[in-house]
Amino acid sequence: MSERTVLIAGASGVIGQSAVQRFAAAGWRVIAVSRRAPDVSADTPFQHLPLDLLDSARCRAAAGEFGGVTHVVYAALYEKPGLYAGWFEQDQMDTNLTMMRNLMEPLIAAATGLRHVSVFQGTKAYGAHVHQIAVPARERSARDPHANFYWLQEDFLRERRARADWSLTIWRPQVVFGGATGVAMNIVPVIGAYAAIQRELGQPLIYPGRPGGVAEAVDADLIADALLWAGEAEAARDETFNITNGDVFTWADTWPAIASALNMEPAFGEPFSLVDYLRQHEGVWDDLVRRQGLRATPLPELLGESHHYADLLFGVNAPADAARAPVLVSTIKLRQAGFGECIDTEEMFAKWLWRLAERKVIPAA
């Protein structure tokens, strides 16, 4: 078999970082496209291409690096500060399409051996952020009639796909958890930083949210394994797949396991905003980072926009009597296609928190 070269766009993000690690471990040549280098283990071989995808001239100039690319994982994402409001704003949608065009147009022209492209959507494809959705949401449902950059990107890729030999796989993951820091939507470092501050203050790990309903999660490493599978699987050609860990959870029921992974006592009280809490305790964080010899990462740099995402997931700003159907998806299609990997969600949280501690991002438990 000829050399397999994967270009991973958004390589420093929660999905991209796991993909870099997994593809490299499987023997692929990896080109990591991101402004920041992915924070992976030191022995992971990859070529970092520090591109700003909003710089079309720079993307065109990099075309010489794209010739040998056989696979693309497009996991790049633009989010506005504060996160949620931007999901409804046309300029944010247009920016995400522009980023994809700037990279993919010169890449498709240069990569004559391109075989497969994976791209990410999510449960917002079903309208989960604007209305109740069917339980479970299935890939065969009609396109939900709301404005979304997912549709702009999908239509762009399908139009290019119609004139080419490569195939396309669209992924709709549930809430993704992984090891990336400073990103828009990964609350693992948010929980880790909050827990470290609470321990520093001699307090238990108080659950900050409302009781909430049944939810699903997906491990970034599991997604990376699915990307590896899809890159070679005939059953993944030109298909759309939901993907989850395989179980369900509630935040309140999972909180004791999260506390245990951090060697802390769980506690429950009234909901409060982690955005506000973390802003108020930046000085405590700075002090414990210095004293415990952690990476010198200011709290805003560690969190990105993910503390806003945490408030959303924990239902902090939801009305106390809010009653909505759970956002659950079917993964039958993916399993029937041949990918059946799963992980216990409580074990997933423990794994990622421990890894952050190993990297000295948060204190050891």
What are these regions (language model features)?
Residues Q121, F156-M185:
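Conserved beta-loop-beta element that borders a ligand/cofactor-binding pocket
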Residues A164, V176-A193, W229-F241, E265:
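Glycine/proline-rich active-site loop of Rossmann-fold NAD(P)-dependent oxidoreductases
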Residues L152, N186-V190, P208-G231, D238-E239:
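Substrate-positioning beta->alpha
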Residues V73-Y74, Y84-F149:
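Conserved Rossmann-fold NAD(P)-dependent oxidoreductase catalytic core, especially the SDR/UDP-sugar
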Residues P38-A42, F46-T98:
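NAD(P)H-binding glycine-rich loop region in Rossmannoid oxidoreductase-like domains
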Residues A9, G178, Y207-G213, F241-V248, ...:
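Glycine-rich Rossmann NAD(P)(H)-binding loop
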